[in-house]
């Protein structure tokens, strides 16, 4: 019963916002204060990207620079960590004057590293005091990253590569390489393998492997099994793994519903190799405007390392896309 008391408010909030979004989308005017602010930010991004492009060399007016930006607020709640929230940003500026392969990326790179995870893995902060729900220092450091990216795709081999050189917070100069390959076995079944490695002068080693197997069972649904392996070596070495088996439904209006089972653990000494398992449900749709998204998620995981049985965890992401 106690678990239901924690879960019910989350369900009510998610359902109410979803219903309100349906009504508001129908009444969209595209002329409110929020719309004007969104337009202003987009125009500023466009202006900045073209100013940078012009400064770098002679430009082609038929191929202007472009920029994209995602601004997110991640909110999480459970009975142990209580409520936490974290602002996150991730952006990209394409610069045609530097050839089509080069761009500038900035913001929290974990948004890209974990973009293949359908469910929420991890938490907003590490080692956050129980009486706090926000860590300005950690949030600022995670978002303080900028790099020049060289991208290439070998179509004959189906391989895509990104190589970043940049600067993170605290003077952390880093290089990052991402290689991915997608193999279409049949019209309905495909495999995608992605390898990410980053080395920083302060953050040291980060290595992550993503493996996906996807089966399309209809025009609007597919079944996915996603496995990741992760290794970090900063002050200490940490290794972990996770596997999500889920089904996703795609609806009109950029709406998706996913549900499945997650398992995960650690390979480190004194840690459970099979630490967590449980079901999750996540939903995503525009709310109020086509550029504003809401993504609630409810999961029921355990935690053997901390002697915790299965408990409800609520997660909500509000995201503005520019």
Give the residues covered by each predicted segment.
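Solvent-exposed N-terminal domain segments of exported/luminal and surface proteins
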Residues: 92-95
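Outer-membrane beta-barrel "beta-signal"
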Residues: 297, 308-322
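Extracytoplasmic
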Residues: 64-68, 86, 99
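Cleavable N-terminal export/targeting peptides
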Residues: 1-50, 56-60
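Surface-exposed strand-loop-strand hairpins of Gram-negative outer-membrane beta-barrel proteins
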Residues: 75-87
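Outer-membrane pore/translocation modules
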Residues: 25-34, 97-242, 253-257, 261, ...
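Transmembrane beta-strand segments of Gram-negative outer membrane beta-barrel proteins
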Residues: 59-77, 159-163, 190-193, 257
């Amino acid at each position: 019963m106690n678990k239901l008391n924690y879960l019910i408010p989350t369900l009510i909030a998610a359902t109410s916002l979803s219903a309100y979004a349906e009504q508001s989308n129908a009444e969209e005017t595209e002329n409110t204060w929020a719309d004007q602010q969104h337009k202003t930010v987009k125009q500023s991004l466009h202006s900045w990207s073209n100013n940078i492009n012009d400064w770098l060399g002679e430009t082609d007016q038929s191929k202007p620079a472009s920029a994209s930006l995602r601004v997110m607020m991640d909110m999480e709640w459970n009975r142990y960590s209580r409520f936490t929230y974290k602002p996150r940003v991730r952006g990209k500026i394409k610069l045609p004057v530097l050839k089509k392969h080069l761009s500038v990326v900035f913001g929290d790179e974990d948004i890209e590293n974990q973009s293949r995870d359908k469910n929420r893995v991890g938490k907003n902060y590490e080692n956050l005091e129980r009486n706090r729900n926000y860590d300005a220092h950690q949030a600022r450091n995670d978002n303080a990253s900028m790099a020049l990216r060289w991208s290439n795709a070998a179509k004959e081999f189906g391989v895509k590569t990104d190589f970043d050189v940049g600067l993170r917070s605290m003077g952390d100069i880093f290089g990052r390489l991402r290689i991915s390959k997608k193999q279409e076995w049949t019209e309905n079944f495909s495999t995608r393998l992605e390898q990410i490695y980053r080395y920083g002068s302060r953050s040291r080693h980060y290595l992550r492997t993503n493996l996906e197997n996807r089966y399309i069972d209809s025009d609007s649904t597919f079944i996915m099994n996603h496995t990741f392996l992760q290794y970090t070596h900063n002050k200490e070495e940490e290794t972990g793994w996770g596997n999500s088996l889920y089904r996703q439904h795609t609806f009109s209006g950029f709406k998706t519903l996913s549900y499945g089972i997650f398992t995960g653990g650690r390979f480190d000494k004194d840690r459970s190799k099979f630490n967590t398992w449980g079901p999750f449900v996540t939903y995503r749709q525009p709310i109020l405007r086509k550029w504003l998204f809401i993504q609630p998620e409810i999961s029921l995981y355990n935690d053997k390392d901390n002697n915790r049985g299965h408990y409800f965890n609520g997660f909500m992401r509000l995201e503005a896309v520019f």
